[in-house]
Amino acid sequence: MQSSGETDILATIGTRGSALALAQANEVRDRLARAHQVAPERIVIKTIRTSGDAIQDRPLFDVGGKGLFTKEIEEALLAGSIDFAVHSSKDVPTFLPDATWLPAFLPREDVRDAFISPRAASLNDLPAGSIVGTASLRRQAMVLRLRPDLKVSVIRGNVETRLRKLVAGEADATLLALAGLNRLGLQDRATRILETDEFLPAVGQGAIAIESRRDDDRINAFVKAIGDSETEVALSAERSFLALLDGSCRTPIGGHCRVNGDRIHFRGLIISPDGTQSYETTREGARADAAALGADAARELRERAGEKFFTLFAGA
C-alpha cells in the first residue's frame, strides 16, 4: 500500500492471534516505526486464524506437521490482503511458496528451552513415572532420552493455556521455549533453564521471521531495515540442515548455529521419538558458507543413520 500522507497506512502485518504471536507482531511494528521514524499506528496488525490454532486435540505431527501455523497467513499474503507476515521461525516450513521469501529476521532471543514444574526443581528431580506434557516430538524424544522412566503426554494450546493445564494437574511438568516466556513477561515461570548441550533447541527457536512477496520491492526494503544479519546467517545454516532431513514435525530434529564474527559453529541432532536412537554432529566454518555447512551436516547424519531410520519412525 503506497502512502503519501502522514497518517496513511504504510503496511499491514499478518499474524496469528495468540498473545505470543501478537507480542512478536508488535515488536516488529515498533522496530519498523523506530527505524523509519513513523507512528506505529501507520503499521496495522491483522490477526488470522490458522489450522494449527483450530486443532487442539491432537499432536501436530498427526495432522500435517509444519505449515499448520503459516498456511492461512501465506494465503492472505499471496492474495494481497496483508503486506507481510510475522512468524515464529520454528513454525516456518523449509520450503515456501515460490512467490514468497524471508527477507528479514529480528535479533534472536534466547534459544533455550525452559523446564516448568510445580513439583520438581529439574527434569532429573522428577520421580519415576511422572508425566511431562508437551506437543513437541523433539521435546518428547529428548525427555525420554534423558529420563526413559518418565511418561510423556500431549499438551496443546498457547503458552498461557499450557501453563494453566500444568497448574490444573494435567501433567507434572512441561517444557516451553524460553524466548516465548520472555516475550510474554512470564520468564519467572521457568523452574529451570535447559542448556543447549543437554537439550538442543528446535531449528529457528527464538527467532522472529518476516515473510513477504518476492516481487514487492517497497515492502522488502521496508522490512529489511530491521533485519539482523547474524540471525539470518544462523537461520541459513539451520534451515538448510532441516531441509535435507525431512523438516516435518514427524522427525525429531534439533539444530543450533552460533555466529562469532566471521565464523560459525553448528550442532545438529536427529533422534527417534522414543529417545533410544540418536545421531549428532558438529561443524565449524566460515560465516559465508552457512547454508552449505548446514546441508553438509544433514548429509552426514542421513548417511550415518541410514534411510531405515527415517522410514522406521515416519509414522511414530
Swiss-Prot record:
Transmembrane segments: none annotated. The keyword Chloroplast does not apply. GO terms for molecular function: hydroxymethylbilane synthase activity. Keywords: Porphyrin biosynthesis, Transferase. Pfam families: Porphobil_deam (PF01379), Porphobil_deamC (PF03900). GO terms for biological process: protoporphyrinogen IX biosynthetic process. InterPro entries: HemC (IPR000860), Porphobilin_deaminase_cofac_BS (IPR022419), Porphobilin_deaminase_N (IPR022417), Porphobilinogen_deaminase_C (IPR022418), Porphobilinogen_deaminase_C_sf (IPR036803). It catalyses: 4 porphobilinogen + H2O = hydroxymethylbilane + 4 NH4(+). One of its GO terms (cellular component) is cytoplasm. Pathway: Porphyrin-containing compound metabolism; protoporphyrin-IX biosynthesis; coproporphyrinogen-III from 5-aminolevulinate: step 2/4. Binds 1 dipyrromethane group covalently. Its EC number is 2.5.1.61. Its cofactor is dipyrromethane. The porphobilinogen subunits are added to the dipyrromethane group. NCBIfam families: hemC (TIGR00212). Monomer. PANTHER family: PORPHOBILINOGEN DEAMINASE. This is Porphobilinogen deaminase. It comes from Nitrobacter hamburgensis (strain DSM 10229 / NCIMB 13809 / X14). The lineage of its organism: Bacteria, Pseudomonadati, Pseudomonadota, Alphaproteobacteria, Hyphomicrobiales.
